[in-house]
């Protein structure tokens, strides 16, 4: 877990300390197996307008995360903190061996302070012919929640999507979400996708009974 602080010079110096991190995230059992993608962000490099590439070990490089909420800054531990307005996060990327149809998608968000707007979370799938499918998650889950000493909450949120096979020959994806106001510190994000397996693997997948979910707890320091 990251403990972070940042000084904001406005009317005076304000110290923001966040005790955040993934606590009890929703981790798919199929992460790291064939026909899956995983991306994780824990140390951001751009607070506003720049691409943040996945930095967690075993992430692929097929996506980037950008904050379009002006006024945000990086904290000492590489969180994205917004002292003046909401965060507006857009994540976008491509598919391995595109076009590919995802079957399951799992998103985890860790933040402290002003909470993430759970109604703002959407996933879009695009093909090369201008078609677009934008859907809300089928499940939005508060995996961890406790009061934050400076106001607001410390939360780990999870969102899931399920898709029918051959819904769209997707070559690109995009995930959007925002916070409900100023003073949000975005600590970590993860995204998992499971795709239609290769024909030779379908019988094996059927024998195994498909995928499932497990949950873990990140050690708090």
Regions found by a protein language model. Give the residues of each.
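N-terminal targeting leaders for non-cytosolic proteins
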Residues: 21-83
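Short, surface-exposed beta-strand/strand-loop-strand elements in extracellular ectodomains
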Residues: 117-130
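Extracellular carbohydrate recognition and processing domains
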Residues: 130-163
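Sec/Tat signal peptide C-region and signal peptidase I cleavage site
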Residues: 14-20
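Short beta-strands within extracellular/lumenal beta-sheet-rich domains
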Residues: 76-101
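Short beta-strand-plus-loop segments that form exposed binding edges in beta-rich domains
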Residues: 174-183
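A short beta-strand element within beta-rich, extracytoplasmic domains
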Residues: 99-114
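A short, hydrophobic C-terminal helix/tail in secreted or cell-surface proteins
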Residues: 198-216
């Amino acid at each position: 877990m990251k403990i972070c602080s940042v000084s904001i010079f406005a009317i005076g110096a304000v110290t923001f300390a966040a005790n955040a991190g993934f606590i009890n995230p929703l981790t798919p059992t199929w992460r790291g197996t064939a026909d899956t993608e995983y991306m994780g962000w824990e140390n951001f490099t751009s607070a506003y307008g720049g691409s943040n590439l996945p930095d967690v070990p075993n992430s692929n490089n097929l996506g980037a995360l950008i904050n379009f909420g002006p006024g945000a800054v990086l904290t000492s531990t590489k969180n994205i903190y917004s002292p003046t307005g909401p965060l507006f996060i857009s994540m976008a990327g491509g598919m391995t061996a595109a076009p590919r149809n995802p079957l399951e998608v799992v998103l985890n968000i860790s933040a402290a302070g002003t909470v993430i707007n759970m109604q703002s979370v959407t996933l879009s799938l695009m093909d090369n012919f201008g078609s677009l499918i934008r859907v809300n998650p089928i499940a939005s889950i508060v995996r961890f929640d406790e009061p934050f000493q400076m106001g607001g909450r410390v939360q780990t949120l999870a969102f899931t999507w399920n898709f029918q096979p051959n819904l769209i020959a997707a070559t690109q994806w995009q995930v959007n979400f925002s916070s409900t106001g100023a003073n949000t510190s975005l600590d970590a994000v993860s995204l998992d996708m499971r795709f239609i397996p290769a024909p030779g693997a379908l019988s094996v997948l059927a024998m195994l009974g498909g995928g499932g979910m497990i949950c873990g707890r990140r050690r708090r320091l």
